[in-house]
């Protein structure tokens, strides 16, 4: 078990001792990250088995209605996924063809609503199709580390990508922040090798993925250490099970814990917050910003 963090503790990122100069971001990312509060990404799962809302939005009319609700609630972008990647297992892998069958009836209509859409998929074929349909961002839960095809595609399309930390299984013996940093170094190496521009990359510590519940808390507590990469940070702690480790609850009962985690992330440098509960998160972030402005 890892001990408490010292105030001076920093993640080592290879030979880098200081943050690299901030790159000129891709225009889509620049627009999202130029707001007075973190951008809010609304989650839309067109799956039967996602951990907190599986099956609710599988029908095309339900998915479109939910996308409209998320935007009305203040979502700055929509993250749509057609394969559950639920933390702690239990999801059934699906083929690229199945993902496409779930996405084809709805993606173009959601893109037409006028906010950027990210496609939550680890399959390059699915992402390629989604980009053709107007999706703006790829969200890869394996951080470009399931072969070079994804990175090469995104480089060719000049498309932004969310690079998420992940592990096949949690290991309570490791320093999770060192593991996250090393993972991101490998992802950035893949990007450089395939020509994917650094300014197209957002880093996500992957709360709940390949981590013990304590490690998810540590990743949130020490999120600011990842600013050493000089890249935007995204955090998605919405309804994750680490909340229940602090306050026992079912996924639908974790709104308070989700907001607490996201406010902590915002104070530590997160520029994008991924959530199921958009209206409440937008309100919380605005109030936090108003309080901080009075200091």
List the predicted regions and their residue ranges.
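Active-site-adjacent loop and "lid" segments of alpha/beta metabolic enzymes
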Residues: 12-28, 35, 52-69, 85-116, ...
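Short Lys/Arg-rich cationic patches that frequently serve as NLS/NoLS or arginine-rich RNA/DNA-binding motifs
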Residues: 2-16
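Catalytic domains of carbohydrate-active enzymes, especially glycoside hydrolases
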Residues: 65-81
């Amino acid at each position: 078990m890892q001990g408490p963090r010292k105030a001076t503790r920093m993640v080592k990122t290879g030979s880098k001792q200081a943050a690299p100069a901030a790159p000129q971001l891709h225009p889509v990312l620049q627009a999202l990250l130029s707001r007075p509060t973190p951008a809010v990404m609304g989650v839309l799962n067109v799956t039967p088995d996602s951990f907190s809302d599986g099956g609710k939005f599988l029908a095309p009319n339900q998915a479109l209605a939910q996308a409209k609700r998320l935007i009305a609630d203040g979502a700055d972008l929509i993250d749509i996924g057609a394969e559950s990647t639920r933390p702690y297992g239990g999801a059934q892998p699906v083929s690229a063809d199945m993902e496409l069958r779930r996405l084809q009836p709805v993606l173009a209509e959601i893109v037409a609503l006028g906010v950027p859409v990210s496609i939550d998929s680890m399959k390059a074929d699915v992402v390629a199709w989604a980009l053709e349909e107007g999706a703006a961002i790829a969200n890869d839960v394996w951080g470009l580390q399931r072969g070079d095809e994804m990175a090469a595609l995104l480089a060719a399309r000049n498309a932004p990508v969310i690079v998420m930390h992940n592990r096949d299984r949690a290991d309570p013996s490791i320093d999770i922040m060192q593991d996250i940093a090393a993972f991101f170094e490998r992802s950035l190496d893949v990007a450089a090798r395939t020509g994917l521009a650094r300014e197209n990359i957002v880093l996500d510590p992957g709360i709940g993925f390949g981590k013990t519940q304590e490690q998810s808390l540590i990743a949130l507590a020490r999120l600011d250490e990842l600013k050493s990469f000089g890249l935007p940070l995204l955090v998605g702690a919405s309804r994750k099970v680490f909340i229940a480790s602090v306050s026992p609850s079912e996924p639908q009962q974790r709104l308070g814990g989700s907001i607490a985690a996201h406010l902590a992330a915002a104070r530590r440098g997160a520029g994008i917050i991924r959530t199921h509960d958009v209206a409440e998160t937008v309100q919380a972030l605005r109030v936090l910003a108003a309080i901080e402005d009075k200091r």
